[in-house]
C-alpha cells in the first residue's frame, strides 16, 4: 500500500507542475530528471537511496568502430523511493549510436508520463488502493506499449536524426517495490539469478531467462514479417544469421525483428512494440543481469550468473562479466570482430555481512 500512496502523492505534485507546462515527451524529460534521485549513464555503480538495491554497469567498445551500446540507471524513478529503472540500448547502422542515445533519453520520460496518466485514470475509475496494487503490472504494460510507440513515432518525425537505415534495440526494467517489470525490444537479454535447491540439500544460483531474443527466424516473428511481405533469409557467408529483408532489395538486412528506427523495413514486419513481462521479487532472487547480444553471443546464462555471483565485490560484477565476454569472443570466434559488450547488474538485497 505504501508504494501506491507515496506514488499518488508524487503524481499530484508532478501533475500540478505539468499544468504550467505544455509539450511532448521531450519536454517531459526535465520532469523525469527531477523525479530521479540519481542517474547513471556511463560505466560505474549506483546505490539505491533508501533501499537495498545496487547497480553495477560496464560497457566495452568492440572492434567495429564506435561503441554503439549505451545504458541508463535511474534511482527514485516515478516519484517513488526505492523504485529503479534500468535500460540498455544497442545501436546498429551508420547512426546507430545516435539512435541508441536518443531512445535512452526519450524512453524514461515517455514511460513516466504514460505511467502517471495510467495511474491517475485508474484512480479516478476505481480509487481503491488494493485495486491499484492488483492492476499495477497491467498499468506498467500499457504504459510501456504506449511509451515505445510514442518514442518510435517521435524518432521517425525527427529532422535531426536519420533513422531510416539505423536503429537500436532497447531492454529495460522497472523495479517498483517487489514488482519487477521487464520490457524488451530486440535481441538483448535479461537473466535472473535465483536460489534453487541442489541435490546435496543446499542451494545454488539458477539462471532464469526473463526475455526472448527477438530474432527474425522465431516462428511468430517470421509469420508477422512474411504477412507484411518481408523476407527472412541468411546470407551465404553468414549461415545461421537470419535477417529481415525488403521484398525488392538485397540490403540492408536486419538481424533482429524488433527495433526502434530502421524505417526502411518497418513496413515489412519489423516493430518497436515491446514484450512486457513481470514477476514478484522474493528473498530467493539475488540479482538480474541486462546485457547486449555482444555478451550473450559468447556467454551462456548460467556462466553469466556464476561470473556475477563470484565477483569479489559487487562494484566489479558488470566489469567482470563484460571482460569475460571480450575474452570469450577472441577465443571462440577468431577472425570475427569483437562486438560491443555491455551489461547492467542490479542486486536486490544487501550483501550478507
From Swiss-Prot:
Name of the protein described by the UniProt record: Probable protein phosphatase 2C 48
Catalysed conversion reaction: O-phospho-L-seryl-[protein] + H2O = L-seryl-[protein] + phosphate; O-phospho-L-threonyl-[protein] + H2O = L-threonyl-[protein] + phosphate
Binding site for Mn(2+) 2: 90, 293, 339
CDD domains: PP2Cc
Span of domain PPM-type phosphatase: 54-348
Stored Gene3D superfamilies: PPM-type phosphatase domain
Annotated cofactor note: Binds 2 magnesium or manganese ions per subunit.
Key word Magnesium present: yes
Organism: Oryza sativa subsp. japonica (Rice)
Amino acid at each position: 500500500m505504501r508504494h501506491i500512496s507515496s506514488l499518488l502523492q508524487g503524481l499530484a505534485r508532478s501533475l500540478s507542475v505539468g499544468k504550467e507546462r505544455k509539450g511532448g515527451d521531450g519536454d517531459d524529460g526535465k520532469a523525469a530528471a527531477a523525479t530521479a534521485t540519481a542517474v547513471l549513464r556511463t560505466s560505474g555503480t549506483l546505490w539505491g537511496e533508501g533501499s537495498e538495491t545496487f547497480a553495477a554497469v560496464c560497457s566495452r567498445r568492440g572492434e567495429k568502430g564506435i561503441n554503439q551500446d549505451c545504458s541508463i540507471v535511474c534511482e527514485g524513478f516515478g516519484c517513488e523511493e526505492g523504485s529503479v529503472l534500468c535500460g540498455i540500448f544497442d545501436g546498429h547502422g551508420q547512426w546507430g549510436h545516435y539512435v541508441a542515445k536518443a531512445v535512452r533519453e526519450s524512453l524514461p520520460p515517455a514511460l513516466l508520463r504514460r505511467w502517471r496518466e495510467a495511474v491517475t485514470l485508474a484512480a479516478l475509475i476505481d480509487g481503491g488502493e488494493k485495486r491499484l496494487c492488483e492492476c499495477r503490472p497491467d498499468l506498467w504494460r500499457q504504459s510501456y506499449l504506449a511509451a515505445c510507440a510514442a518514442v518510435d513515432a517521435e524518432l521517425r518525425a525527427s529532422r535531426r536524426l536519420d533513422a531510416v537505415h539505423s536503429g537500436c534495440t532497447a531492454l529495460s526494467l522497472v523495479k517498483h517495490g517487489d514488482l519487477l517489470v521487464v520490457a524488451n525490444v530486440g535481441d538483448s537479454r535479461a537473466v535472473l539469478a535465483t536460489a534453487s535447491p541442489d541435490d546435496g540439500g543446499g542451494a545454488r544460483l539458477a539462471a532464469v531467462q526473463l526475455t526472448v531474443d527477438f530474432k527474425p527466424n522465431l516462428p511468430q516473428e517470421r509469420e508477422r514479417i512474411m504477412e507484411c511481405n518481408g523476407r527472412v533469409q541468411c546470407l551465404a557467408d553468414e549461415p545461421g544469421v537470419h535477417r529481415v529483408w525488403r521484398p525488392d532489395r538485397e540490403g540492408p538486412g536486419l538481424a533482429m525483428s524488433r527495433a526502434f528506427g530502421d524505417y526502411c523495413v518497418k513496413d515489412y514486419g519489423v516493430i518497436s512494440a515491446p514484450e512486457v513481462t513481470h514477476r514478484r521479487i522474493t528473498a530467493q532472487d539475488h540479482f538480474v543481469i541486462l546485457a547486449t547480444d555482444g555478451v550473450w553471443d559468447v556467454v551462456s546464462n548460467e556462466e553469466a550468473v556464476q561470473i556475477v555471483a563470484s565477483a569479489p565485490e559487487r562494484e566489479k560484477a558488470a566489469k567482470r562479466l563484460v571482460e569475460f565476454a571480450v575474452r570469450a569472443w577472441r577465443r571462440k570466434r577468431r577472425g570475427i570482430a569483437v562486438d560491443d559488450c555491455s551489461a547492467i547488474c542490479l542486486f536486490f538485497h544487501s550483501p550478507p555481512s
